[in-house]
Amino acid sequence: IYIPYFVYKTLVLWKLRLDSSAMITHRGRIEYRGNGLNDNVLLYVHGSPGGYDQTTDPGKNYSVLTPSRPGYLGTDILSGSSPEAQAACFKALIDELKLDKVFVMGVSGGGPSAMHFAAQYPQNTSGLILFEAVSYSENFLEKDEALINARDIDLFIQLSFMTCFGSKKLAASMLPNKNNRARLLANKRNIRLLKKVIWSIWPISRRRSGIKNDYNQFIN
């Protein structure tokens, strides 16, 4: 298993570098993905853990801009640890990209910084969308500690098994809200996208600073 694993990891890390762009702002270097940005831009704020690769597809009438939040992949944690500071990073990025207004979507652990962006910069916010967003503080769970401290190879094996689950079990493991699970299961394409999202937490070693910071921000 070790040789295929190391080959796969090398390819993943190479692709992560290849598929992203970076902008030097007054908040530091911010990694992002956003091609063909137009007048209708969705600022997609990824969850915990995640990165610019945890995103959604552009639509017919809108493009998608996904930054890596501080501590994830190519954005240094020093750019901003609190949700307020991360919102300031997003503001710095859209200013450099000459974007006046964006729709903001906060997913999971990206919810707090998305909400702060909308509150702090209403002049730059066309709308706010929240999906399974963190909206209150809570303490670590045992499974959270295990994820934060996981080795890349152990998580690789775990995710490989997870993506072999039946659709219902897989959805239940990822989405607490029953209505959201039902909508996801109604479309086979959604299951394929969910499996893609699951792998966007790997390799965890490139996202560990971000998830540790998130939990420090979110716990009681």
Briefly describe each language-model feature range.
Residues I1-S21:
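N-terminal membrane-anchoring alpha-helices
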Residues T25-N35:
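A short loop-to-beta-strand scaffold at the N-terminal edge of the catalytic core in hydrolase folds
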Residues G34-G74:
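Conserved HGGG/HGGXW glycine-rich cap/lid loop of the alpha/beta-hydrolase fold
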Residues S82-A87, G111:
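Conserved donor sugar-nucleotide recognition element shared by glycan-biosynthetic enzymes
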Residues A85-F103:
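Conserved acidic catalytic loop of the alpha/beta-hydrolase fold
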Residues D100-F140:
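Conserved hydrolase catalytic core segment
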Residues L128-L159:
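Flexible "cap/lid" loop of the alpha/beta hydrolase fold
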Residues I148-A150, F156-N220:
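Alpha/beta-hydrolase
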